[in-house]
Amino acid sequence: MVTIIDGEGLVLGRLASTVSKRLLDGEEITIINAEKIIISGNKDFIYAKYKQRVDRASISNPRDLGPKYPRRPDDIFRRTVRGMIPYRKAHGRAAYKNLKVNVGIPKELEGQEVVEVEQAQPKNITKSMELGTVSKLLGAKF
């Protein structure tokens, strides 16, 4: 059975750590509304950090040489989770394949039961930015 989690209003790092633990336990997880996941912190600092990562590609041949960092919100979340699991080992790669991330709510998932993640709820966050906003600033089209 697939666990569906709505990412709207949840904190990126807390949600990613919870999801990575569940993936390593063998669950299949689908995240919806990835563009509404929030990143806590100063907006200028958040944008500068992600912009630096995207611009870090090789000068000589940026299409072929890495590191390649994503711009889309669903891919940014997948990359965050990937950093929390041993994706180069067999069990980590198998766990990573059980993660599906969607922008918005796909038609086949409408009306299905959504699991609440209490650990990822924001607590006393005054400065934050949504993943969708970061992606648009980085030039993503989704």
Swiss-Prot record:
GO terms for cellular component: cytosolic large ribosomal subunit. Keywords: Ribonucleoprotein, Ribosomal protein. One of its GO terms (biological process) is translation. InterPro entries: Ribosomal_uL13 (IPR005822), Ribosomal_uL13_bac-type (IPR005823), Ribosomal_uL13_euk/arc (IPR005755), Ribosomal_uL13_sf (IPR036899). One of its GO terms (molecular function) is structural constituent of ribosome. This protein is one of the early assembly proteins of the 50S ribosomal subunit, although it is not seen to bind rRNA by itself. It is important during the early stages of 50S assembly. Part of the 50S ribosomal subunit. Belongs to the universal ribosomal protein uL13 family. HAMAP family: Ribosomal_uL13. This is Large ribosomal subunit protein uL13. It comes from Methanosphaera stadtmanae (strain ATCC 43021 / DSM 3091 / JCM 11832 / MCB-3). The gene is rpl13.
